[in-house]
């Protein structure tokens, strides 16, 4: 999924900016026990193997942060193997230190170099809840071109929520003490939703315009939740496309978190929730343009992406007479070019 998104992010950001940064805050050793590439190596290879690499004129910096010495050393060895293959405008650096303090220092250096507008993609995939304070995430989101991808370890949080020594970590994680209200909720699903909604709202308060949220399961076991914060409508849509392209894979499956929008399976997808969401949004508003519908679906108000609008939703809706189309705004039946006007019934 990370590779899918970066395949779009690198050429878009790398063509229009002087410098771009990929920051992995909990980079790990660079590979898993089975030999599979970890996120920092995936990121570097996604650039090296990109068919549009020549379009990326920006200076690209990979900043890979790992707190544990042995993991950082192993990662550095893997990065050194790839370094000779990197183009002259790219550099990868491994930093053996803690995420929160190091990211603050990196952003301070960026700002001091008059590169405050340099886009950043910051990946935060911790084990646990410490070292990921909301104020640091907010520092990233102050830049309108920057994005954060956070793995939210709900099961870890749920396990230690009543452990006094973790309270200060949770205060910093959420950037508020309101999380304590969730401790009184007995129902597990309601409690989980409370924490999810709080974290999503805190990301918005920290500066994110859109927050994409999905859960990843292994079988029936929740592994973690993903929160992607961005200022870009296109980025929001691209992330959802990336998630759908890899869902499901092996024993893993993604689930959307909007009401009724749960199973993300490309081979057996249910687009009923998308149809219902569009109807709920636009019914009673008279004629709306295809552009308005596209903007709604691209946003974080649905778990779907814009490539699914026409053939998967509008065509069956038109066949079922759930929408009316102004025929003067198109030339062919069951087609919805720019400027098409629709009325939802």
Give the positions of each predicted feature.
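Charged catalytic carboxylate motif
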Residues: 1
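SAM cofactor-binding core of SAM-dependent methyltransferases
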Residues: 4-106, 306-314
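ATP-dependent adenylation/nucleotidyltransferase module used to activate substrates
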Residues: 52-56, 120, 126
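Class I S-adenosyl-L-methionine
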Residues: 111-120, 127-320, 326, 338-339, ...
């Amino acid at each position: 999924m990370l590779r899918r998104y970066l395949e779009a992010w690198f050429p878009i950001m790398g063509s229009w900016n002087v410098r771009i940064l990929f920051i992995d805050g909990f980079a790990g050793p660079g590979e898993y026990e089975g030999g599979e590439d970890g996120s920092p190596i995936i990121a570097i290879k996604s650039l090296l193997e990109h068919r549009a690499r020549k379009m990326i004129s920006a200076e690209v910096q990979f900043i890979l942060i790992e707190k544990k010495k042995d993991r950082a050393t192993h990662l550095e060895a893997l990065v050194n193997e790839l370094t000779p293959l990197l183009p002259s405008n790219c550099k990868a650096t491994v930093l053996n230190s803690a995420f929160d303090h190091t990211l603050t220092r990196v952003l301070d250096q960026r700002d001091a170099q008059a590169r405050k507008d340099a886009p950043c993609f910051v990946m935060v995939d911790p084990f646990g809840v410490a070292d990921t304070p909301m104020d640091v995430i907010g520092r990233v989101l102050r830049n309108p071109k920057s994005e954060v991808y956070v793995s939210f370890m709900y099961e870890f949080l749920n396990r230690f929520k009543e452990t006094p020594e973790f309270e200060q970590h949770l205060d910093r994680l959420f950037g508020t003490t309101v999380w304590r209200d969730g401790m009184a909720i007995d129902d597990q699903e309601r409690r989980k939703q409370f924490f999810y909604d709080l974290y999503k709202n805190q990301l918005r308060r920290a500066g994110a315009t859109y927050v994409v949220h999905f859960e990843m399961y292994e079988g029936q076991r929740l592994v973690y939740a993903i929160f992607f914060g961005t200022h870009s409508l296109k980025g929001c849509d691209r992330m959802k496309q990336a998630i759908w392209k890899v869902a499901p894979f092996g024993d893993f499956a993604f689930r959307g978190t909007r009401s009724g929008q749960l199973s993300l399976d490309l081979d057996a997808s249910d687009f009923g929730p998308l149809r219902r969401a569009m109807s709920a949004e636009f019914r009673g508003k008279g004629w709306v343009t295809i552009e308005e519908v596209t903007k709604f679906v691209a946003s974080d108000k649905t778990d779907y992406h814009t490539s699914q609008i026409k053939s998967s939703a509008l065509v069956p809706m038109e066949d079922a007479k759930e929408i009316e189309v102004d025929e003067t705004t198109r030339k062919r039946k069951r087609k919805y070019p720019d400027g098409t006007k629709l009325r939802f019934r």
